[in-house]
Amino acid sequence: DMTLENPLCVLNVMKRHYDRYTPEMVAKVTGMDPDVMMKIWQVYAGTGKPGKAGALLYALGQTQHTYGGQNCRAMSIVQLLLGNIGVPGGGLNAMRGEPNVQGATDVACTVPDLPGYLKWPTAKKHRHLADYLHAETYADGYYSNKPKFMVSFLKEFFGENATVENDYGYEMLPKIGPRLPASAWTTMGTFHMMRDGRIKGYFAWGMNPAHSTPNAKFARNAMANLDWLVCADWFPTETATFWKAPDMDPAKIQTEVYFLPAALIYEKIGSISNSGRWVQWRQQGVLPPGEAKSDFEIIEVLFDRIRSLYQKEGGVYPDPILKANMDYKVDGKYDLRAVCWAINGYTVQDGKLLPGYAQLQADGSTACGMWIYSGYYNNEADKLDPMKQPTARRSKEDPSGMGLFSGWSFAWPANRRVLYNRASCDMKGRPWNPEKVFVEWKGDKWLQYDVGDFVTANPPDNKAFFMTWEQNARLFSYAMADGPMPEHYEPFESPTKNLLNDSVQAPCALFTEDKDNRRGTTQDYPYVCTTYSVTEQWQTGAQTRSIPWLNELISCNFIELSEELAKEKGIKNGDTVRVWNNRGSVKVRAMVTIRMQPMQINGKLTHVVGMPHHFSWAGSFATGDNGNDLTPNVGDPVSFIPEYKAFLVNIEKAA
């Protein structure tokens, strides 16, 4: 409805939905000073006009909630309404908590996706390949090419065993079954199944769930039910030594634990992807010590041994193992370059690397492990030399003058630096900001200073988002499990009621009814706690807590609290304090600061305290109690991320 008058026009639906969100109500819910809040809104809303731009940068403070996905949706809607998507200086930009989180999600270390964000098939909806392609292929937009992406993926996955007669091996691809949803296979879900005896073996690849998992004490108890545990890591982490935790009895734990020394990032070659989707190649700095191996080599050796056992002994259904295309070798040796060829894609007949994903086909003539990366390693003439591939480019020239640096590494897809850059122009192809131009319609063609994120053969129209079937942005989205438009909910544990609707917590939040969450109330736990990082430590501290000079800077865990709360509780800076709730109890040092301040939430004075998540009992130097013993194992229904950022505790000066 171009007149925006129809009551079912999305913009009008949004207006009605958010009528309750008055400035006064928002200030009451959030505890923000109303004048400061209005000033922020006014300044940022000023970016919503031609020649202006505003960027939203966010991190785990927005995502680690039971409504984290909707937080991101809300920011997306703000940026779309202001015209800040696809323009120079705009965007909704994630500040990742790890160097290669982007790469990990790209290659599908998450539950619901295959590599390249192809949906993982479900047994009920996608029984056959035709069912999958019918359900997942868009009628218009670039995902109308999904059959090319999926068939090429299957062709790489099963190689010569993927034929048109067997649907390119689709029947062998594991499906999400009807009995257990995808959430059951997330980090939190797997520990519930460990507790219940449904999972008997566990691999921890460069992760430390005995420390990092929410409600970590619950996770450690669940691990005690395992028959075996394999840890591939740099140091003996809390997970590798979980039976030594202060709250565990080693005599009662029969789990067989195998520790595989893994190579550090500096001790192996490979690519790393940042938040800008730049896939950057890294050379090996030094050889790994002793028996340490890269994750790639460990997986390859393990798979070869497993396949050998299936060949000798058979099994219930050995085909997916025996027919998998897992021979990533060069001259008979495991070689990551062969993985790069598989990811980039190649023609099946002659093995030549593809220039990019535009060459993918749905007839089995091309193979490609991850379509979005196609083109990142495409120099066929020097395919054995990573340093002569697009991913290793290091040009410092920037003809755009806007920080695109298109000759530095490779940005997926197609070396496109800014997604949705068609939105930087009006419907006639004229840039909103003539001084900063990504793309521009001149005469009878598009001039491109960045790779166009649209069908550049077409003249200007109103289609700026060609990864959706309608090729428009979505203010109203049917892709979210918890609703088409963001709505406010309180955390799983909250000091207040929900002032905006009758449901206190997000109704679709995961695991909220699980018996081991042990929800607390303000009657027993009156203070809101949040977790965060410090510059001097890294994640669970496996590496940084083994470096002496870093631990001279931050040597122990602490609770950060306001001067007002410290005075009320008789706590001084440096005191040892006890912090506890229904899930656990920890002793840490007090850090009294003005950074933490009481807030007026729904007219009530509310204290907030904060605690880093880096410390626990294992480590060479700095050790201590684990703050994640207090966090609840509940999560977002879309991203499955835990709610580390808000929960209830009590605090007192330790005896």
Question: How does the language model describe each region?
Answer:
Residues 1, 13, 28, 80-256, ...:
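Extended redox/cofactor-interaction regions of prokaryotic respiratory oxidoreductases
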Residues 1-50, 138, 143, 299:
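Long, well-ordered, tryptophan-enriched scaffold segments
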Residues 7, 21-25, 57-62, 278-288:
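Flexible glycine/proline-enriched surface loops and loop-helix/loop-strand junctions
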Residues 51-55, 86-95, 312-321:
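Flexible, glycine/charged-enriched surface loops at secondary-structure junctions
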Residues 227, 231-237, 241-243, 287-303, ...:
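Phosphate/diphosphate-binding loops
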Residues 255-288, 592, 613:
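Glycine/threonine-rich phosphate-binding loop and adjacent beta-strand/alpha-helix elements that clamp
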Residues 270, 277-377, 382, 387:
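Long, C-terminal catalytic modules of enzymes
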Residues 297-350, 450, 457-460, 477-487, ...:
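Long, contiguous, secondary-structure-rich segments that constitute the structural scaffold
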